[in-house]
């Protein structure tokens, strides 16, 4: 191997090293620029933060109202069931009375 080819190979190695480092720096910069652009284009988070506190303040009363609504729905179902029993009981009573009336009319 001659001195010229050795120097040429060494020069290529230096150029490749410098080129690789430059590409690495460029990749890091591109990634940082892309992340900055994404952050800028998503808008402000102030409105999200303001809404989050309002939502958390309303969560406890909302849960309490849900519990009350569940209790009321249970009472409504029970009342409807009792009303249905009363209707059936009244219908049965009416049938008994009608049957007695028929029997008493037939006996005369």
UniProtKB/Swiss-Prot annotation:
Origin: domain of life: Bacteria
Subcellular localization(s) per the UniProt record: Secreted; Fimbrium
Keyword terms of this UniProt record: Fimbrium, Secreted, Virulence
Annotated Polar residues bias: 41-56
GO cellular component: extracellular region; pilus
Tagged with keyword Secreted: yes
Keyword Secreted in annotation: yes
Signal peptide range: none
Disordered: annotated segments: 41-73
UniProt induction comment: Expression enhanced by contact with host cell wall. Also regulated by HrpRS and HrpL.
Homology family: Belongs to the HrpA type 1 family.
Function in brief: Major structural protein of the hrp pilus, which is a component of the type III secretion system (T3SS, Hrp secretion system) required for effector protein delivery, parasitism, and pathogenicity. The hrp pilus functions as a conduit for protein delivery into the host cell. Also, affects the expression of T3SS-associated genes. Required for full expression of genes that encode regulatory, secretion, and effector proteins of the T3SS. HrpA-mediated gene regulation apparently is through effect on the mRNA level of hrpR and hrpS.
Official protein name in the record: Hrp pili protein HrpA
Organism of this sequence: Pseudomonas savastanoi pv. glycinea
Lineage, opening ranks: Bacteria, Pseudomonadati, Pseudomonadota, Gammaproteobacteria, Pseudomonadales
Gene that this polypeptide is encoded by: hrpA
